[in-house]
Amino acid sequence: MRPDVQWRLCWENELQLPDHLELSEFFRKTYEPTGAFNGKQFEGGRSWAGARPELRVIGYDVHGVAAHLGLLRRYIKVGDVDLLVAELGLYGVRPDLEGLGIAHSISVMYPVLQQLGVPFAFGSVRPALRNHVSRFCRKGLANILSGVRVRSTHPDVYLDLPPTRVDDNVLVLVLPIGRSMSEWPAGTLIDRNGPEL
């Protein structure tokens, strides 16, 4: 039986301190099983990991936050082409609801993507999530690009690390919104020009 999830679409400046605290707890519990550092970045009420989203879709049920997806419009560089996209990230589903799937979050976000008039939405996920996102892509709304590296800045300055990092072990998810997939630029390197969402 599908849980009764109510979706809230909110701009970042509409969130209040209790919202950030609840989301921070949600992200710690959702991301810690993938590695202690992944949960640590949400300590102290922080409800974002790298870049801060401008818009969020938050699913709630009787137990609190059930799911989350963030959006940030930005220009990325694909090969030699500058491209406006809506980056989708900070995706999470509470562990007891893992069957809820990314399709539910994106279906709530999709009309907003159309209203924003962006040509594409894009995000990157760990290869371990291939089956998870493949189910969504079978519906024809998105495409998985493999063999694409993604360069990002670190969200903070670390004296022992270079200012950028390149992920060459990610899957890139592209949703054509205002353009067709055939208009996505060719290239094997995406430069975020900032931290990951």
Swiss-Prot record:
InterPro entries: NodA, Nodulation_prot_NodA_CS. Signal peptide: none annotated. One of its GO terms (cellular component) is cytosol. It is found in: Cytoplasm. It is an enzyme of class 2 (transferase). PROSITE patterns: NODA. Pfam families: NodA. One of its GO terms (molecular function) is acyltransferase activity. Its EC number is 2.3.1.-. The keyword Metal-binding does not apply. The keyword Transferase applies. Keywords: Acyltransferase, Cytoplasm, Nodulation, Transferase. Gene3D superfamilies: 3.40.630.30. N-acyltransferase required for nodulation. Acts in the production of a small, heat-stable compound (Nod) that stimulates mitosis in various plant protoplasts. Belongs to the NodA family. NCBIfam families: nodulat_NodA (TIGR04245), PRK00756.1 (NF001974). This is Nodulation protein A. It comes from Mesorhizobium japonicum (strain LMG 29417 / CECT 9101 / MAFF 303099) (Mesorhizobium loti (strain MAFF 303099)).
